[in-house]
A protein has these predicted regions:
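Structural motif
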Residues: 43, 75, 105-107
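Active-site nucleophile and cofactor-binding loops and adjacent substrate-binding regions
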Residues: 74-82
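Short, basic, helix/turn surface patches
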Residues: 66-74, 101-103, 132
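Catalytic metal-binding/acid-base residues of hydrolase active sites
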Residues: 46, 77, 109-111
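Short, flexible coil/linker segments at or flanking structured domains
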Residues: 25-28, 60, 75, 90-92, ...
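Flexible, glycine-rich active-site loops centered on histidine and acidic residues
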Residues: 2-20, 81-135
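Glycine- and other small-residue-rich loops at beta-strand/loop junctions that grip anionic moieties
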Residues: 52, 76, 125
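N-terminal beta1-alpha1-beta2 module of alpha/beta enzyme domains
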Residues: 1-72
Length: 135
């Protein structure tokens, strides 16, 4: 069996500055390696304190320099919201920074509010997702 930790970057504590929430989340992520976890995952969400991590590749890049054995995974890169070539470039760089420890997960996204904020019709999700996988 393998064990993993999912970073959601939730700010559930009223009055806690977002910067402190991010630092706390990163400290927990670093501890997962010390505790023997196999993988540390990061979600991608936008525009809501439920999960405040608009760029999970950036968050994992930070961890790449702070860890040495734990795998680092995207849970997930939401393809309809990202340009496929930029996703490939960013993941290539992250994989190099973490010496091949990257686990790449993709998704379509599920929150209508996120689609609306990006100005994307949610009905386009499947087509955008499929097109990104082919590109």
């Amino acid at each position: 069996m393998q064990t993993g930790y999912l970073m959601l970057f939730q700010n559930a504590h009223e009055g806690l500055p977002d910067v402190d929430m991010v630092k706390n989340e990163m400290r927990l992520a670093e501890l997962t390696e010390e505790c023997g976890f196999d993988v540390c995952w990061s979600a991608e969400h936008h525009f809501d304190s439920y999960s405040m991590v608009p760029d999970n590749v950036q968050a994992l890049s930070y961890l790449a320099g702070r860890t040495s054995t734990i795998k680092l995974g995207t849970a997930a890169v939401i393809l309809p919201w990202n340009t496929p070539i930029r996703v490939a470039e960013k993941l290539s760089m992250l994989d190099a920074l973490c010496d091949g420890r990257l686990v790449f997960g993709v998704g379509r996204g599920l929150a209508r509010t996120e689609y609306e904020s990006f100005g994307i019709d949610m009905e386009e999700a499947r087509g955008r997702f499929d097109e990104a996988l082919v590109d």
